[in-house]
Amino acid sequence: MTKTRLLSQSFFITLSFACFPVPGVVLQFRDGLNEEILKYTNKFRESKHLPALEMRDDLNEIARKHSEDMAKGRCSFGHSGYEQREAEVKKIITPFYGMAENVASGPTTGKEVVTLWKNSPGHRENMLGNYKYTGIGTAADAKGSVYYTEIFVQ
């Protein structure tokens, strides 16, 4: 077998394994989902004559980490570690006036997760609160269950 053919086959085998998810590995659910969630969140706020939220990459990263922690089982589903996330946000947003957080698991589209939150009194209150910024993060576990975190900051 020629050296070129051997290298070519090795590359193909390596590439083949790289295309399959490894059990336990968390993946971002899909591109554009954060923007879709933002769109429906702001559409809901607009329907109540509230200003649109501004999505920030630094807040997205904080939200993504929490979704990933839930997907990997490093924390239970919910608001574990909220105080630490709030402390991180306080370092980024100054002056800091307040923060709220919504989490969810199950829906597969931005519209579905926002509808779920709209129909829950506490989540709805967060979405309609006096906030200026948002951070959104998603992660899927090895079984494909999607975890969502949206934080709201003033």
Predicted regions and their residues:
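Bacterial N-terminal signal peptides that target proteins for export
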Residues: 2-11
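Functional surface patches built around histidine and acidic residues
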Residues: 19-154
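Bacterial N-terminal signal peptides
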Residues: 10-18
